[in-house]
């Protein structure tokens, strides 16, 4: 991720998923890394995919549902990143940046959900 923040959430979630994919390319191909990376690739992509679906809502109930799924996927991405950080010493700084980004996604999505209530 660059130093300049992306404020469009669709673009920002795309950048997060992309950056997670760049990360997994560079990690050692251990059994645990392969499994954790598969999960990270899925969950990081789902953050943005569900956010996009929320924007194409079929109603308020669908909007909240999709936003909650997007937030859940951000939480899950954070979990996989934390596991990867513990087992990949040489990539800790890069992974920590992604953990912070996942956390920011959670906060942003929570704020949107709370405004809808």
Annotated model-derived regions:
Residues 1-117:
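Amphipathic alpha-helical assembly/interaction segments
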